[in-house]
């Protein structure tokens, strides 16, 4: 059975990816499960540049290690707020300076939107997936979902900006959604549904 190696050290992101891809006839592994200790510097100027770089570095490492029957999947995701000209964007995970500090990032976002009216608080979550096959073929998929940023945290599910991102069709924030609800409509869910079509053809 082929292995799909997730080029991420973010445990919550890995959990989501595994949940959405769990019905595929493929073994899904994290970097930790494959004993890969690589931190890829995300210095690209777009989500795609970062996702591709992560996937490519792990791909090259696995080729050099002599691995067979594998695919590498990387995800670069973030929040783009209209009023803030697309911020935090590619800096979503480190918006407040420290990587992965959800509380500080949310605090900074709310501060930057202080006094901004609801109609100007539109935002979208973006997920860019980049995948390399064992033979070096490259695939990319993008998923997006629109909503708006509320004025205080609501819900303790998900991670990142989920408790601030209000999704009108369900009348809830992403932080209030059950994992299966979120995965069915989120930016990552949308992108992975498209990627599944590709995977079913090549595995």
Enumerate the language-model features and the residues they cover:
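Anionic-ligand binding patches
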Residues: 2-5, 11-203
């Amino acid at each position: 059975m082929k292995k799909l190696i997730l080029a991420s050290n973010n445990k919550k992101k890995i959990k989501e990816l595994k949940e959405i891809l769990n019905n595929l006839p493929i073994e899904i592994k994290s970097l930790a499960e494959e004993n890969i200790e690589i931190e890829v510097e995300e210095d690209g100027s777009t989500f795609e540049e970062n996702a591709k770089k992560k996937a490519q570095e792990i791909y090259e490492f696995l080729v050099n290690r002599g691995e067979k029957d594998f695919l590498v999947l990387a995800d670069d995701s973030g929040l783009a707020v209209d009023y803030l000209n697309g911020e935090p964007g590619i800096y979503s995970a480190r918006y407040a300076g420290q990587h992965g500090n959800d509380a500080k990032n949310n605090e900074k976002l709310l501060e930057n939107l202080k006094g901004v009216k609801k109609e100007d608080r539109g935002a979208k979550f973006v997920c860019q997936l980049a995948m390399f096959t064992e033979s070096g073929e490259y695939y990319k998929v993008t998923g997006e979902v629109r909503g708006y940023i509320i004025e205080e945290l609501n819900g303790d599910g998900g991670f990142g900006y989920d408790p601030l991102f209000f999704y009108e069709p369900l009348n809830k924030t992403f932080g209030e959604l059950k994992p299966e609800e979120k995965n069915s409509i989120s930016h990552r869910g949308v992108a992975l549904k498209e990627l599944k079509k590709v995977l079913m053809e090549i595995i």
